[in-house]
């Protein structure tokens, strides 16, 4: 209709978030690792600006229950607050002997704390991993754990005339734009054939992100002269996840053990270090008695030392259970050198368990 006008308005609501970090160092920590030690409680702490909200950390050296007996469990507990509940997010990590942040675990969703309620991780760190690397985790027999807490505070509105719209993060804009080039096949200059499907792509982006594609185009290999370039060794879903990462740095479907198992070899073959790290993280978090042997094989085949170390440590802790699985029995035949490495890791862990007793006996002579 002539004369119609569109009016736009916007508002701004600010949610205050208070953040603080608490470092807790426990001396002579090796003495807490015996079966008799149920839990250790930190000193009470609070945010400087909110003294009325008091917290503490609780650490269980032998786990909090039967299921977590092979792990250290750690929790954040609300001790007191003028108003309840308290809404907060939190993150735990360890400081190793090099002063580095290790084993970061965070809660991504806001948690609701009532007084004396606690939230945390009952499988925070494998006891066997700690005992077999005591010099790294316990410098001078001191264990340092850190907790970052983000507390949701007051909510208030700001007048429209005093606020301008926020500017979108340019890094996100870049990945969105590159993703659009891929999704909509805009201005492409090469074609990839995967499982009978053709995909238009950009040589410059492929070469910049993957040394394998770069070598292919630089050296004018046979594949670079063909159109389309046939990719023989990738499943269609794996290819799409890999290409999505190449263009955007994201892998939105990489959350299951099976998907990570399929994507890891592709990431290794095409030199996508960032994608390998994402796969390692998923596989580490999904380690279980059932998956341990297969994960160890994958780590060995694709040169992922962190994942291999985690798998060996897990197998050392759960040796009896893992050795009964069909995957382990199959590995005896297909990858005997990994079985030997697993036994070596188990022997090292056992030596660490026995070491305090040996010292005790020698002191009694």
UniProtKB/Swiss-Prot annotation:
Coiled coil: none
InterPro entries assigned: BTB/POZ_dom, MATH/TRAF_dom, SKP1/BTB/POZ_sf, TRAF-like
Domain called BTB: residue spans: 188-250
Family listed: Belongs to the Tdpoz family.
Species of provenance: Mus musculus (Mouse)
Matches recorded under SUPFAM superfamilies: POZ domain, TRAF domain-like
GO biological process: protein catabolic process
Disulfide bonds: none
Domain MATH: 19-149
Cited SMART domains: BTB, MATH
Pfam families assigned: BTB, MATH_2
Protein name in the entry: TD and POZ domain-containing protein 3
Source taxon at top rank: Eukaryota
Gene3D superfamilies: 6.10.250.3030, 6.20.250.50, Apoptosis, Tumor Necrosis Factor Receptor Associated Protein 2, Chain A, Potassium Channel Kv1.1, Chain A
